[in-house]
Design a protein with these regions (language model features):
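Sequence/structural signature of long amphipathic alpha-helices
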Residues: 1-120
Length: 120
């Protein structure tokens, strides 16, 4: 029997990342926030390029050699597409975290410059 709250989204990597971010983001240091804000866009770009290349290659494989047996089982194509969908969802979540991290880092820096505490 599941004791998971009905208010939580379906569990997947993107939703898990966003939930953890919402819980932890306000407690991170400027360095940690900058790490997310500066590192995530590069990773998102790299992974998006990788997904584009993989899906293009799969399209070519399927269209050029229908008799190769590649993705010939009933659920092969849907499994690949679901995997790609989950990867793209994670990239979207990571982009959201990076954007928010940049905003929070800037907010903390401005508060520090004014001699106060961010969020106070």
């Amino acid at each position: 029997m599941s004791t998971t709250s009905k208010k939580l989204a379906v569990f997947d990597a993107a939703n898990a990342m966003l939930l953890l971010w919402r819980r932890a983001g306000d407690h991170m240091t400027e360095d940690e926030l900058d790490w997310f804000a500066e590192g995530a866009p590069d990773l998102v770009q790299l992974q998006a390029d990788y997904i584009a290349n993989i899906t293009q290659g799969l399209g070519c494989l399927i269209s050029n050699d229908a008799s190769s047996g590649a993705l010939s089982e009933r659920y092969d194509v849907s499994t690949v597409l679901w995997n790609v969908s989950h990867q793209v969802g994670v990239l979207g979540a990571l982009t959201s975290v990076a954007r928010d991290a940049g905003f929070l880092a800037q907010h903390k820096k401005q508060a520090k410059a004014k001699g106060g505490r961010a969020g106070a």
